[in-house]
Curated annotation (Swiss-Prot):
PANTHER family: ATP DEPENDENT LON PROTEASE FAMILY MEMBER. The active site is at S1032, K1075. It comes from the Eukaryota. This is Lon protease homolog 2, peroxisomal. Its main location: other. It is an enzyme of class 3 (hydrolase). One of its GO terms (cellular component) is peroxisomal matrix. Belongs to the peptidase S16 family. It comes from Scheffersomyces stipitis (strain ATCC 58785 / CBS 6054 / NBRC 10063 / NRRL Y-11545). The lineage of its organism: Eukaryota, Fungi, Dikarya, Ascomycota, Saccharomycotina. Residues 416-465 are annotated as: Disordered. Its EC number is 3.4.21.53.
Length: 1180
């Protein structure tokens, strides 16, 4: 809606648009080119922003503010008066939306030009930012702007121009709303041909700026402004000098009186000037406070001086019309001109008139400073040279008397009784009937009734209370009654504390007592908790996008399909509950004929006649009485509807019945547990908070301290809710196994924090979690708690029982290769300063051989933390080479080959792993040398060699008696591991004494018994500085003992793990996958012996590996594998072939120790007695 007024002249471009309007409550005059911070009441800011709600729906701070109020706009918007639009706002019209779009186009063209805009410069540009839509016309409040004679501004002369501004910032200080307004240009009101809404105005915007004799105009403005700057600088210097003189003289007395015309000597003998009365001049004080009393003004004034200084220092600097127009408004807006003068300049549409008016204002201000200087010189001369001491004393006394009267007038100033009565009665009509109202009858979400047993505080505001107390009052009056998650008893306790703080503030001494500050801090914290606020990416649960959530999880993490599957199941349940709840609400409304929320608002205005006149008694005029009746009518109607809504809310609460999962991610460090929790929050669109529990040893850190203690604060859970600003965040309880307490046996003087977590992490109890500081239950059922632990079995049994544990196992070589190439390397390339690009190979290219060597030789871990650290090191080296290539010193090669790794990463680490294949000087003997498998504390697996050497006591000592076999074990072995060795030796002894085995070429039955009784065994496990423990090396040590006794070597390519019993049974162990990866990385292991009962673990890991590879596992195949596994001799070997192909290791299973002997030495007839088919009486 734009047109040219003068199509013959391209520079004369004018635009006619319709824009929303807003009248300020203060006397502020907005001049174009300046950014203003304007404070609005929360209600008026909400009413203003409500008009744009369809255009700024994604701005969270606006949505949060609008959620505090429920506006009921009238359908017949054209018939509503403008004042009613403030209390019953409606969204802006389509014409106003088009006006904002057209204004944005012309504004963009004006910014890109040198001040001359033509039709060809107008491009099709749409607002890109949601704040671009917050464009409005600001109308000055003429009632608040006074002339020097204390008369109001004539509205007929100064009501035709508005300031077109844009809201560029919003700050919520819990009491008021501060809007940052960027004043853009002027708009001239014109009479519309078609009727517009009362809060919208047809405006004419003049974008033309053709100024004849621009340089002459600018020279006049520059000269006048520079003269004013000199006068201002001189005044500030004189005033500060007067302050310093009076301050120095004030060391002896309040006012130094010297003899006329004399100069006096100071204490140090220096000559000083007499005092200066400039600081006693009210005009001087007012000017100084405006010029130097504000940092914001000082900063703006210096910027204005710099702008003029640029043109003053360079006469040849080109002055364009845009700079000239900007200087006009900036000069008037920054300098201390009164508001009525600024209003006159705002209404100067003609640029020539605007320039002349500003120069006249500047010259008038210069005269004021000159007059002030002359008057001050006269007074100083008379006071210090001609006045007698009595006259001086009278002057000082009159000054003090005037100050005292002024202070008394300020402190005793009260509102007229008639006005106070009107306001009080109107507030009572809004708030005195158990209903939250704002403005003129704007009702809240539900009435403030006490039908639910709660107590409602309903006392009028006190204008003289501080802002913090006023914010608490607004919370108690307006928000607390509508909080659905608080019980009536909890609300009653909060209101009781609020009444105590109000009584303390009104008692003698004010808020000086300790209880006042303690309760106020408590109420501020209660107010800061985000009650009934739920943040999510989706508008409702039925709109949950499962594909998006799955894609988000896949993009952030590779594999971990079992974790992702559990989260997708949770989202599916939420989606179904949302669909069911909506259907239940719809059916309920049809059965009970409940009107929809959109139609209920129109019924309120038709029932005014139903309210009896005697129900409200007000001793005020008819207009206030009518408003009172209207509010009372809305109260009764809303109470009637609330009875029906209480039943519909039961259907709405169906969604909340689904308890959020409480998950524990257990696994070694560096496997992505913490980052997975962040990804979960991102996929759900919820806020994320991390609580580190490592080293927490006080129960009060979880539950909070009681208010009786000094410095008491809520616990970590409530603090996380406050930081997240929602009641349904994703809270990560990191390192929950590091909590000090539980089974650790520490002193329980400060309580057990792990016991405090029992209530938090129990879905059946956390709906009413009580923090000691708050003292009332808080609903945590919608919070998703995700715990992480490295050693989950360190947790107490009750706490572990409450958690849904999901194991995040160690990554194998193939997974690390994919993770490093797809996730870690691109992230390190970006973090180390390389240009953004989709092809990272152009900057750092690591081939598979080099990546494998980094994984195997430079990192030995279960996770990928050290792998990312090594990739970061390589990227930093390549960044140096890339910069040298940019400077032309050398050619940049992005490739990283295996031979380059020592240059970047140094010498590969010594793995410490070796196997029995290593040769020794003892004829390369492998007797007694057996490869075991260990699960390390960092979550990785490795090969652990067990060495046993036997000595016959009879050699060199023929008289040695059969004292029995002795055993010495070294290598920093733990108690459980040493017991396993003793059990293994006892089992071997039982085989020998029962004659179940025989030595090769020694048919004598007593040979092995005599050898065993005269044998001295020494078992050692290398890497003696590392502690080792656990029962899984039972069959390994037993095999080592038997190898020495039979003098039979053990194959070097075999590794084994399993717990042994005294009967020779092989029991299952843990960490099979990690041990298999350790054997694979060793490089020398080709066969692996595991307990037969661990095959089901390998089947589960097989299924998980197939899913993470992107393939679909056939459910029939899994059923067949599990059914086949129940047989003693399984027939399906698909699992074993999978691991053979993936790791190059053939898996064997052992139910009893005889299976181990058979795998190692085969069907050796000399090994067992011919008559004995099995070595045990007990068979599985």
């Amino acid at each position: 809606m734009a047109r040219y007024k003068n199509p013959k002249s391209p520079a004369k471009l004018k635009q006619q648009i319709v824009l929303p309007t807003c009248k300020l409550d203060s006397n502020l005059v907005l001049l174009p080119g300046i950014i203003y911070n304007v404070t609005f009441s929360r209600f008026k800011a909400a009413a203003l922003l409500y008009r744009y709600k369809d255009l700024v729906s994604q701005v969270s701070i606006i949505n949060n503010l609008l959620n505090e109020y429920e506006f009921n706009p009238s359908k017949d918007s054209d018939s509503v008066e403008e004042d009613d639009m403030v209390t019953s706002p409606i969204t802006i019209s389509k014409v106003a939306v088009e006006g904002i779009e057209q204004f944005f186009k012309y504004e963009a063209a004006f910014k890109n030009s040198q001040g001359l805009v033509s039709e060809k410069d107008i491009a099709e540009v749409a607002p890109s930012n949601e704040f671009d839509w917050l464009t409005l016309a600001i109308k000055p409040n003429l009632e608040k702007i006074k002339e020097p004679s204390n008369a109001q501004i004539d509205p007929t002369e100064h009501n035709s121009v508005v300031t077109i501004a844009r809201i560029v910032g919003i700050v919520d200080d819990t009491t008021n709303i501060k809007l940052t307004l960027q004043a853009i240009t002027r708009g001239l009101k014109i009479a519309p041909k078609k009727k517009t809404r009362p809060n919208e105005q047809l405006l004419e915007v003049d974008w033309s700026s053709d100024i004849p004799e621009l340089r002459r105009h600018f020279k006049s403005l520059k000269d006048s402004s520079l003269d004013l700057f000199k006068v201002i600088d001189k005044f500030i210097v004189d005033y500060r000098q007067a302050l310093s003189i009076n301050s120095a003289n004030g060391n002896k007395s309040n006012l130094q009186i010297t003899k006329p015309g004399s100069r006096y000597k100071g204490a140090n003998g220096s000559s000083q000037k007499p005092g200066d009365l400039l600081t006693l001049n009210p005009l001087a004080n007012a000017l100084y406070l405006q010029l130097a009393g504000s940092k914001d003004f000082s900063k703006a004034f210096l910027s204005l001086q710099k702008l003029y200084g640029q043109f003053a220092s360079d006469e040849n600097l080109k002055v364009d019309t845009k700079s000239y127009l900007r200087l006009l408004d900036l000069t008037c807006g920054i300098l201390p001109f009164p508001n009525h003068e600024k209003l006159k300049l705002l209404h100067k549409i003609s640029i020539d008139d605007r320039g002349n008016e500003l120069i006249n204002m500047i010259n008038q201000l210069i005269k004021i400073f000159d007059t002030l200087d002359g008057n001050n010189s006269f007074v100083n001369h008379w006071f210090y040279n001609e006045a007698t001491n009595i006259q001086k004393a009278n002057v000082v006394a009159n000054q003090l008397k005037s100050i005292r009267l002024l202070l008394e007038g300020m402190t005793n100033k009260t509102r007229p009784i008639s006005n106070r009565g009107n306001i009080k009665s109107f507030n009572n009509s809004e708030n005195g009937n158990n209903n939250k109202t704002n403005g003129s009858g704007i009702t809240s979400r539900r009435p403030k009734s006490n039908e639910d047993g709660g107590e409602v505080y309903d006392e009028e505001d006190d204008d003289e209370e501080d802002d913090e107390l006023r914010a608490i009052t607004n919370f108690i009056k307006y928000k607390l009654p509508n909080i659905t998650t608080l019980s009536p008893d909890s609300k009653r306790l909060i209101i009781k504390d609020f009444k105590r703080i109000r009584a303390s503030s009104q008692s003698p001494g004010g808020g000086g007592n300790s209880d006042f500050h303690v309760i106020r801090n408590y109420l501020e914290i209660v107010m800061d908790i985000p009650w009934d606020k739920y943040v999510t990416k989706f508008k409702s649960n039925k709109d949950i996008d499962l594909n998006f959530a799955k894609k988000q999880l896949d993009d952030d993490h590779y594999g971990l399909e079992h974790v992702k599957k559990r989260l997708i199941q949770y989202l599916v349940v939420l989606k179904l509950l949302g669909i069911n709840a909506e259907k239940q609400i719809s059916d309920f409304r049809k059965e009970n004929q409940v009107p929809s929320p959109s139609s209920s608002g129109s019924n309120l205005a038709t029932q005014n006649s139903l309210v009896p006149a005697s129900s409200i008694v007000i001793a005020n005029n008819d207009e206030t009485s009518f408003a009172h009746k209207q509010a009372q009518n809305k109260v009764k109607t809303s109470i009637k509807e609330s009875n029906i809504e209480n039943q519909t809310n039961q259907s709405i609460q169906v969604t909340k019945y689904n308890k959020s999962p409480i998950i524990m991610l257990a696994g070694p460090p560096g496997t992505g547990k913490t980052s997975l929790a962040k990804s979960i929050a991102s996929s759900l669109g919820r806020n994320f908070q991390r609580i580190s529990l490592g080293g927490v040893k006080d129960e009060s850190e979880i539950r909070g301290h009681r208010r009786t203690y000094v410095g008491a604060m809520p616990g970590l859970i409530i603090q996380a809710l406050r930081k997240s600003r929602s009641m349904n965040p994703v809270i990560l309880l990191d390192e929950i196994d590091k909590v000090i307490g539980g089974s650790s046996g520490v002193n329980k003087f400060n309580g057990d924090p792990s016991a405090a977590l029992l209530e938090v992490l129990d879905p059946e109890q956390n709906t009413s979690f009580i923090d000691h500081y708050l003292g009332f239950p808080v609903d945590l059922s919608q919070v998703i708690f995700i715990c992480t632990a490295n050693e989950p079995h360190n947790l107490t049994r009750p706490l572990l029982d409450r958690l849904e544990m999901i194991e995040v196992s160690a990554y194998d070589y193939n997974e690390k290769l994919i993770i490093g190439r797809k996730y870690l390397l691109p992230r390190q390339v970006k973090r180390n300063g390389f240009p953004a690009s989709d092809r990272i190979e152009e900057f750092v290219n690591i081939d598979d051989a080099s990546m494998k060597k980094i994984i195997v030789d430079y990192t030995r871990e279960a996770g990928v933390r050290n792998l990312e650290r090594k990739l970061g090191t390589i990227c930093r080296f390549k960044a140096v080479e890339y910069c040298e290539g940019l400077s032309g010193k050398s050619f940049y090669n992005p490739n990283v080959e295996e031979a380059d790794l020592p240059k970047y990463l140094g010498i590969p680490y010594s793995s410490g792993d070796f196997s029995s294949i290593e040769t020794t000087i003892s004829n390369n003997s492998r007797v007694g040398i057996v490869n075991g498998l260990s699960y390390n504390s960092d979550g990785s697996g490795s090969v652990l060699v067990f060495e046993t050497i036997g000595f016959d006591k009879r050699v060199g000592n023929p008289n040695s008696s059969n004292t029995g076999c002795s055993l010495v074990m070294t290598g920093r072995l733990g108690e459980v591991l040493m017991e396993s060795g003793k059990i293994g030796l006892t089992f071997i002894k039982s085989l020998i004494y029962k004659n179940l085995i025989q030595a090769k070429e020694q048919p004598d039955d007593k040979y092995l018994i005599e050898k065993f009784n005269n044998l001295e065994l020494n078992l050692h496990v290398p890497m003696g500085s590392i502690s080792k423990d656990g029962p899984s090396a039972g069959i390994t040590m037993a095999t080592s003992f038997l190898s020495v006794i039979l003098d039979k070597p053990v194959p070097a390519d075999v590794a084994m793990t399993g717990e042994i019993t005294l009967r020779g049974l092989v029991l299952p162990i843990g960490g099979v996958k990690e041990k298999m990866m350790g054997a694979h990385l060793n490089g020398n292991i080709r066969r692996m012996i595991v307990p037969r009962e661990n095959r089901k673990d390998l089947i589960e890991e097989f299924s998980r590996s197939v899913e993470e590879a992107g393939d679909v596992v056939d459910s029939n195949l899994m059923n067949e594998l599990l059914k086949d596994n129940e047989e003693a001799d399984f027939k399906m070997d698909k699992v074993e072939k999978f691991y053979l192909k993936r790791y190059g290791i053939q898996i064997f299973y052992a139910r009893e120790f005889y299976d181990v002997m058979k795998i190692l030495w085969g069907e050796d007839d000399l090994l067992t007695k011919p008559k004995s088919n099995r070595i045990l009486e007990y068979h599985l």
